[in-house]
């Protein structure tokens, strides 16, 4: 039907005629009366207008149903603890109603519009709704009711690919044929050729997509079937392997096919157990007939059900035939449980291996990297040392390669043997009196000074010469450009002189030798040169490359020549450093000041350190609150090669740590805390290893006496040197155990720790505060104060010697000749003797010698002279004596009388 009136078209659509006229006017079709004729052009214009008005992208007659299901699963983490994880599954389903405008429309006005029929054309199946109406009058079909019936009863709907993204489920609706047989509008008449072509292409795309999905589903099913067959064959092989060597006759009947299993589910024998099918509740006692059947339940009987159970309950997992070798990345510290997890073995296996290697460990014990690598290789895996995920790796990013390099003053370290005049030499250069202020006249700290000379600025580092300060001297050589080796002309080359040469050569630093004390009459500079040549330090006038300068720190002779030699050596090195960048440097020394907190001596090596900078030094960080030079004057900035004291760090840094300026306080705190944790883990692992080693040593050697010490000093380098020297005093019988070392005054916590651990408190250049002194009086803790390292080492050495068990020594006190032997019943043999020399005492120990051979060693039982018991008989007197429990005495025997005395031992 090509044309119809407005009233007829309104009745066909089920709309009021007035509403249709309004929509036509909105579409630009000028119709005013109900009898006006509508052409195909007018209907197309109306359709396009309605599409533009309501849009076709989001059809109104579409319902999206979402379903959310939350379940919980239990999963174990790397440490073996079970954790509950919530899993949320969301499903989305889209129900679409077909638009009545796309189907043949019934022209009867009074009849209700029935639900749309199942559409067979593929173009209409994939089509979206064309005419959604905003008014409730337009939709005569009760859509929500139809959807609820669809969800509740769920008849078999016809699936049509309406929207591939959402769920591709459409509502199937039935067609009710009406009695009126009026002409109908077809979809081809309502839709243009372009729209139909578009829908055909969409239908073809949907068909191709469904074909691809069907092919993928088929492949997945084939793969699953293939895996099931492989698992079945593996299960049969395992069952055959288990049945080998049994006494019963093997089951000859083949396993039933999968089709037969479903058919025999309800038989008497019952393919599956009605209760406890997997045998978890009861293991059951296997008889001889059950030996070849794996995985059966406890109700299974007979060979028929055995083979059936074997198929149904055989797990698909097959054990690997070869050992799996893992590549294990081992960090610096790792617990036993984590190491087992990385190797995919039980923690008990790792503990067993460690016990075989002589280590008693627990699952949470921390192992160091070296031990963990040995364990991994012992268990047949490949161990690799893991690169640490250190946040300080980002510190190298801020390299300032474009910074201008400027000349800087040389850093000169003065090294040499103790009492050879290092500090006195510096005193003359600085025109100060430092050596007289040092305890005992020896240097026990690194002193850093910068000196203005007529030839330029020089920074001096004065190091201790005592043997205990090896680590300090090594730090001084590391931070320096030139080493002045001070050798006394009257003393020559000594052990610490040789050690200083080794430190300088290890750091690849040039040496200038200062032969000191040439003003003494016994000075012999040539001997110094000869002794140093044997240690590869050859003077220039002997064809070498080392400058020798003869000086006197007392008279000042040769000091100018020494400075000239040092500056000449520095010019050869062409020392340069950038100045206008964030500073980097080295911690020379650190101490805890009671009023100012942690104080650190820092040598700036590059850049400029300013007040207010955020710095990181090892495990300490903080903002520079104040900077002081070596004279105690306040400075605002310090350039390269300038030593300064800084205040404001969170803790006392370790000497030798690198100092770096950071812009971000948060990053500085993060790196410092990371270093603290790493240091603590490594220290704990080493302590544990040391405890185990000492435990096995004690088991082998018996009880070892231990002297517990707590050391507090004024600076970090002092307690480092003191603890190293004291630990060297340990022997196999007595050991020094340093429980705690620290910087600062002795506090109450130190006293409490000493009281709990029965330790001796040593204060080196520090004293106890008021609260600690009261606690010391009440607890009776032994506290010793020292200013010189010699005295501390000597007293601890004496204390260790007192702890040694005394040595027993035999002391011969007399010799007795037996001249007559009397045999007395009830008494035994009594000897008449003559004391040749010495003295004989009652209850002394004697040694019986016959023909110069010791026959018996024992004690005197009685000693008499003229029938009287006496305590002792001196030489040239006669006496009678008897031996305890020994009667084989002959005339002519010699008795050697001796006493056992205890002699105190020393280290």
Swiss-Prot record:
Task: Give every tr-type G domain span.
Answer: 407-576
**Positions of the region G1?**
416-423
Residue positions binding GTP: 416-423, 462-466, 516-519
- G2 as annotated region, ranges: 441-445
Compositional bias (Basic and acidic residues) at which positions? 223-235, 251-263, 270-281
Highest taxon of source: Bacteria
Where does the UniProt annotation locate this protein?
Cytoplasm
> What keywords appear on the UniProt entry?
Cytoplasm, GTP-binding, Initiation factor, Nucleotide-binding, Protein biosynthesis
Ranges for region G3: 462-465
The record describes the protein's role as: One of the essential components for the initiation of protein synthesis. Protects formylmethionyl-tRNA from spontaneous hydrolysis and promotes its binding to the 30S ribosomal subunits. Also involved in the hydrolysis of GTP during the formation of the 70S ribosomal complex.
Please name the HAMAP family in this protein's record.
IF_2_B
Q: What is this protein called?
A: Translation initiation factor IF-2
What does UniProt list as this organism's lineage? Bacteria, Pseudomonadati, Pseudomonadota, Betaproteobacteria, Nitrosomonadales
- The primary gene name is infB
